[in-house]
Amino acid sequence: MKQNNINAIRTSHYQNQDALYDLCDEYGLYMIAENNLESHGTWDIHQAGIRGIEGVLPNDKPEWKAVLFDRMNSTYQRDKNHPAVLIWSLGNESFGGETLLQMAEMVRRFDDTRLVHYEGVVNDPRFLETTDIESHMYSTVKDIKEYLAQGDKRPYIECEYSHAMGNSNGALYKYTELADQKDCGYQGGFIWDYIDQSIWKKDRYGKWFQAYGGDFGERPTAVSYTHLTLP
């Protein structure tokens, strides 16, 4: 990974095996240590106009506070002594709200030496102070430049980008060129994801390929969920 200029890992979307943190400590890979939280479907439904904001989870609901604090505390206590961890992430794609703000404040009480990351406030900007980093997903380079032009002094990252199917990664170099610009504010991003979700399988002609959704006769399936399928 380091030989290919990869210098950071986001443990999306939950704690990873202990050995990964040890390896990052040893080899000098930065880490965003992410808490186990995702409620993607609830705010998708809200943004589609099917349900009001009251249906989004965890949002401002006090009944979620105890379990989310417990999860975040477990993440912190397990991984706090790993020097590779530079940033704590509250979770993935769970909208915003007061409960997440309170989680961020808890982490800052525990540890004022690391940054707090949370992307979901992009979709619910009521509590922008939840995150120390401006974090987006799948923005175009044009979108990133337009945001940076607004003058936000916080560091900007793409916590997910380049989830590309087939041969559709042609503009990836533009993100790298932007990150290489001095003092532009864009810190880089985390490619989703490092390893394709595929399994080697022979086709009907005996040729090996990387099989994925639908290639085993299963339905329903996510279908196109991998990159290149032939060596």
Regions found by a protein language model. Name each.
Residues 1-228:
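Extended substrate-binding grooves/exosites of carbohydrate-active enzymes
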